[in-house]
């Protein structure tokens, strides 16, 4: 059990963890291992590095700084967030489950949209990005989940007791380990239908009749968590006030997931604000 759980170990999440820990609160940082920052070859516009620094080095140094202070950092993909009977947050990961009094979402903007013809055309007409949000509309119907990782399995689990037929489509990738659902590993050519989704067509010419398609590529992004627990979003970003608080008490967001200027300096500032706000929330709780 922790005071604060932070999902995401980029500049925003790590900055938040430093302020939470310095306030003598227990904090756990979870991250999937995928970082947009690590892909940056050189960052030469951040204070204190006259010769620049690679994104990979800055990412690793940030985690090292947090761990040196006593922050617990775990490389575990967060899959699901919910509130328990004690009004605390449960975060389920690929390895287990953790509990905290406050939650900070700093995942970046990770939503992956496969390059499949028809996805955008049928958004809101059978193509969805949230099983918990929209699964109810597909009671006793046939649906497909597009994805090949643990997040796809998590979305499938949210659907299995609602829908009549469930198929995981990996779009040419190997099936995820431990998958108990019907799987098709073929490359997808197109999502087709009239006014709504009617089928998924594969590159070999065969097709699968479905009423809905749930896109769950990659790992869960901040907006994915947000929608499942009632946090206000705008597109793929989370809406916050000036103190990085969302509309759900005890949940804060910072960094790229809030939109706006996508820079390290902004992420670090918002992380500090979110960390302090989480501490103040716990004091007043």
Predicted regions and their residues:
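FAD-binding core/adjacent interface of flavoenzyme oxidoreductases
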Residues: 1-5, 72-140, 214, 238-246
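Glycine/Thr-rich phosphate-binding loops of Rossmann-like dinucleotide-binding domains
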Residues: 38, 113-114, 154, 210, ...
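Glycine-rich nucleotide phosphate-binding loop and flanking beta-alpha elements
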Residues: 13, 111, 152, 208, ...
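A Rossmann-like FAD-binding core segment of flavoenzymes
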Residues: 37, 66-85, 90-92, 98, ...
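Short loop/helix-cap segments at secondary-structure boundaries that form the rim of catalytic
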Residues: 38-40, 115-120, 136-138, 174-181
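Beta1-alpha1 glycine-rich phosphate/pyrophosphate-binding loop at the start
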Residues: 2-57, 141-175
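FAD-site-proximal beta/loop scaffold in flavoenzymes
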Residues: 115, 121-137, 217-262, 270-276, ...
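Small-residue (primarily alanine) positions within well-ordered alpha-helices
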Residues: 16-17, 267, 274-275
